[in-house]
Amino acid sequence: MSLPLHPSLNNGITKGSANFSGGKLRCKCSSSPVEVTLAGNVAHNHACGCSKCWKPEGAIFSVIGVIPKEQVSVTANADKLYIVDESAAIQRHACSGCGVHLYGRIEKEHPFKGLDFVHTELSSEKGWQEPQFAAFVSSIIEQGFDPSKMDAVRAQFKSIGLETYDALNPPLMDAIASWTAQKAKI
């Protein structure tokens, strides 16, 4: 039985284009949608099981990538955006009309400061980097997912070619650890 991981993953992965130059994200509002323009492709696109990321209705995971904040601009209806949790490291900017998260920005000192987190599924353009891995997989249990089905979740990710982690993937965890060591002058 197939689990509803995410609409963009449920039928396998669509490969992105190495030459993709970006596009527009739009919230789900039928009139006056918030529009965010991305002037490039994302990196480190991944399925995320954390409790903070926005997920489409019925999905167990979100799919989220990062892009330099200089390549992100709100191009329509910015007045509808609000920050979901101002105390969070990632300031998730969501639409007050439909609740969709358009981008997350880190304003405080952090290893990923300068990168914005975005959901490319909100774009009608094709060519975005495909998901590379699944992160924070066990976190879905904290949101009510049945722990006895975790092997099935991991098997389904494996069947579409994605490794699963209960944090980020090793290169990103290495980047965080390197940043932390540098700050501590180790």
From Swiss-Prot:
Keyword check for Transport: no
UniProt KW keywords: Lyase, Metal-binding, Zinc
Database matches in InterPro entries: CENP-V/GFA, Formald_GSH, Mss4-like_sf
The protein's annotated pathway: One-carbon metabolism; formaldehyde degradation; formate from formaldehyde (glutathione route): step 1/3
The protein's required cofactors: Zn(2+)
GO molecular function: S-(hydroxymethyl)glutathione synthase activity; zinc ion binding
Any GO BP: formaldehyde catabolic process
Residue positions binding Zn(2+) 2: 48, 50, 53
UniProt domain CENP-V/GFA: residue ranges: 20-166
Cofactor note: Binds 2 Zn(2+) ions per subunit.
UniProt binding sites for Zn(2+) 1: 27, 29, 95, 98
E.C. designation(s): 4.4.1.22
Keyword Nucleotidyltransferase attached: no
Family the UniProt entry places it in: Belongs to the Gfa family.
Descriptive protein name: Putative glutathione-dependent formaldehyde-activating enzyme
Originating species: Fusarium vanettenii (strain ATCC MYA-4622 / CBS 123669 / FGSC 9596 / NRRL 45880 / 77-13-4) (Fusarium solani subsp. pisi)
